Curated annotation (Swiss-Prot):
PROSITE patterns in UniProt: PGM_PMM
Cofactor requirement: Mg(2+)
Biological processes per GO annotation: carbohydrate metabolic process; peptidoglycan biosynthetic process; UDP-N-acetylglucosamine biosynthetic process
Keywords assigned by UniProt, alphabetized: Isomerase, Magnesium, Metal-binding, Phosphoprotein
A Pfam family assignment: PGM_PMM_I
PANTHER family in alphabetical order: PHOSPHOGLUCOMUTASE (ALPHA-D-GLUCOSE-1,6-BISPHOSPHATE-DEPENDENT), PHOSPHOHEXOSE MUTASE
Name of this chain's protein: Phosphoglucosamine mutase
Length: 451
């Protein structure tokens, strides 16, 4: 059987790939791998289960809970919550593991299952592979009588999380007017409450979830409504989440987007000033803009680049003791307070920096100037040879030499298709386009699969 787990758990069409049967049996397997193999003898393991509000989350959540409880795991049902809230609760109540039911920024018909290790951390690939092996073997445990798991509603789950968030920010938000776009998702209740508790005047859009409208024309993948609301209301800034609120993008008072790279730059500078940025280092990915590198160099901050995916950012952070990292898409990990990307925490910290400095977000964002970027997908090519083909590597080297310190080149093979993504950043858009097209020609000439 091919690997069930993708880059962020199991994800697909609910009742298509992701059936109730699959959800229950994966949970039975996780009960063994994450629960019984670690819990003290004679003690039932515990797990937190949460979901993001999609209609399908109700039956998938029921299947997950059934799989866990029937395997002798005590379940704390946290209801509809952001992914980072579920991760926080796993650590807060010292559960053995957690399960988040969400498809993040995907449309409503999709759903997903993400297992969280003890402490709320994402699972390494090897542990996911072990869960799949147990799932395929169908060698589940089936306790009876007093050994079956019990299900408890965690009624104060959201309140615990909000208290944690508000307690983390270094400066209150009194006097700030903020528009929140909750993507009709899991943060529709928690985010407005957290920002209000922190002192902000809050206006909310995209906070009327009906199970079918998550990410539908709102949220971090659709910033138009937020930009319009900020301008019309004369707000200081806007914050957008995705469906499970593990990411955050922002707009300034003019409605101009502030992306994940800019947010990380603002937070890194703030943390360095406060003496709280471990080793004066930020972890981003190979996709982060060269402008971030240049701005951090100016601020005396080291940029470490990881592979694309917040899990790889986190792996680098944990391995080296760094405490700030993230992606251009708005996944920002602040390891002093969270084990995963947290859109609410990120938004609160960003707003706190605005309040602390008295500077508009527009001015803070100018710390970093985004370099013009051109990305072209080259199809039907031998993606495996992209990093070994001598003519292609020579073309890349020539491009890098021409661009010098004011440009950057990245050839990134697709994980699922015979495609190589050619990305070039340069001082001008025209330079980036010209150099990218030359590289595309080299890739097509030397890596084409067509006979």
């Amino acid at each position: 059987m091919s690997r069930i787990f993708g880059t962020d758990g199991v994800r697909g069409l609910a009742n298509g790939l992701l059936t109730a049967e699959l959800a229950m049996e994966l949970s039975q397997a996780a009960a063994i791998v994450l629960g019984h193999r670690h819990a003290p003898e004679g003690q039932r393991p515990t797990a937190v289960v949460a979901r993001d509000g999609r209609a399908s989350g109700e039956f998938i959540g029921a299947a997950v809970t059934a799989g866990l409880a029937s395997s002798g795991v005590d379940v704390y049902d946290a209801g509809v919550l952001p992914t980072p809230a579920a991760a926080y609760l796993v650590g807060d109540i010292d559960a053995d593991f957690g399960v988040m039911i969400s498809a993040s920024h995907n449309p409503a018909p999709d759903n997903g299952i993400k297992f969280l290790a003890h402490g709320g951390k994402k699972l390494p690939d090897a542990v996911e592979d072990t869960i799949q092996q147990v799932y395929e073997a169908k060698d589940f445990v089936r306790p009876t009588g007093a050994e079956v798991g019990r299900v408890t509603r965690l009624s104060d789950a959201e309140d615990r999380y909000i208290l944690h968030l508000v307690g983390a920010i270094p400066h209150r938000l009194d006097g700030l007017s903020i528009v929140l776009d909750c993507a009709n998702g899991a943060a529709s209740g928690a985010s407005p409450d957290a920002f209000r508790d922190a002192g902000a005047t809050v206006h909310v859009i995209g906070a009327e979830p009906d199970g079918l409208n998550i990410n539908d024309g709102v949220g971090s993948t659709h910033l138009g409504p937020l930009k319009q609301a900020v301008r019309e209301l004369g707000a200081d800034l806007g914050i957008a989440h995705d469906g499970d609120a593990d990411r955050c993008l922002a707009v300034d008072h003019t409605g101009t987007e502030v992306d994940g790279d800019q947010i990380m730059c603002i937070l890194a500078v703030a943390m360095k000033e406060a003496g709280r940025l471990n080793q004066d280092t930020l972890v981003a990915t190979v996709m982060s803009n060269l402008g971030l590198q240049l701005a951090l160099d100016e601020a005396g901050i080291t940029l470490v680049r990881a592979s694309v995916g917040d899990r790889y950012v986190l792996e680098s952070m944990v391995a080296n003791g760094y405490n700030l990292g993230g992606e251009q898409s708005g996944h920002v990990i602040m390891a002093d307070y969270a084990t995963t990307g947290d859109g609410l925490l990120t938004g609160l910290m960003l707003a706190s920096r605005v309040a602390q400095t008295g500077m508009p977000l527009q001015e803070l964002a100018r710390t970093m100037t985004r370099m013009p970027q051109v990305m072209i997908n080259v199809k039907n090519v031998d993606k495996a040879a992209a990093k070994t083909s001598e003519p292609v590597l020579e073309a890349v080297a020539r491009t890098e030499e021409r661009l010098g310190a004011e440009g950057r080149v990245l050839l990134r093979p697709s994980g699922t298709e015979p495609v190589v993504r050619v990305m070039v950043e340069a001082a001008t858009h025209e330079d980036a386009r010209r150099e990218a097209e030359q590289l595309v020609s080299a890739v097509e000439e030397h890596l084409s699969l067509q006979s």
